[in-house]
Amino acid sequence: KMIDMGCDVVLATDFNPGSCTIQSMPLIISLACLYCGLTIEEAFIAATWNGARALNQENIVGAVSTGYQADLLFWDLNSINEIPYWMSSNRILNVMKKGELLEKEF
């Protein structure tokens, strides 16, 4: 309903030991789709662009575009629509942070 009313919804882990020990954004995206009724597209916008805007970082992160910091996840999926169905599995193949591929420690 909030999205239909034009509100910008943000998804985040808000990791806080003791009250919220979830660190997995794929899990948060899955929960938003399965229990809150967001489409996968709405969940991705909420987890990326809207999150960047909420932190006043929309000129740096939150989109894949020229001039943006390249923070990317590479997934083992045929479509982003599969994410809610893999919520308990790590389907991430690789991570890029600021344009550099990270060593596979995830």
Could you say what each language-model-derived stretch is?
Residues 49, 69-106:
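C-terminal cap of metal-dependent C-N hydrolases
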